[in-house]
Amino acid sequence: MSVTTIKDPRDVVLAPVVSEKSYGLIDEGKYTFLVDPRSNKTEIKLAVEKIFSVKVDSINTINRAGKRKRTKFGWGQRKSTKRAIVTLKEGTIDIFGGPLA
């Protein structure tokens, strides 16, 4: 018997990714988000549909290992992240909402 817990969508989708590559994908109807590393594609799809009121066509996920960095005291490591590239069926997401200055 599996027990499912209902996650808050804001705990699944953490933030949009702001980069040149993600800006280029927006023209194709693809949006990139940082997501919780423990979440799966189904949870990500439900969260995006609930938060932004859009229909999701597909989800591609990427697990990125944290970079190894030299510190004063030896070697450290940056945090590992998971990204989701969300393709919409139709419509757009206003990621950077608010008026432009």
Swiss-Prot record:
Key words, A-Z: Ribonucleoprotein, Ribosomal protein, RNA-binding, rRNA-binding
GO BP, sorted A to Z: translation
Pfam families for the chain: Ribosomal_L23
GO CC annotations, alphabetized: ribonucleoprotein complex; ribosome
Keyword 4Fe-4S: no
Top-rank taxon, per record: Bacteria
SUPFAM superfamilies hit by this protein: Ribosomal proteins S24e, L23 and L15e (SSF54189)
Molecular function (Gene Ontology), one example: structural constituent of ribosome
InterPro entries listed in its UniProt record: Nucleotide-bd_a/b_plait_sf, Ribosomal_uL23-like, Ribosomal_uL23/eL15/eS24_sf
Quaternary structure and partners: Part of the 50S ribosomal subunit. Contacts protein L29, and trigger factor when it is bound to the ribosome.
Family: Belongs to the universal ribosomal protein uL23 family.
Function, as annotated: One of the early assembly proteins it binds 23S rRNA. One of the proteins that surrounds the polypeptide exit tunnel on the outside of the ribosome. Forms the main docking site for trigger factor binding to the ribosome.
PANTHER family cross-referenced by the UniProt entry: 60S RIBOSOMAL PROTEIN L23A
Protein name: Large ribosomal subunit protein uL23
Species: Paenarthrobacter aurescens (strain TC1)
Taxon lineage: Bacteria, Bacillati, Actinomycetota, Actinomycetes, Micrococcales
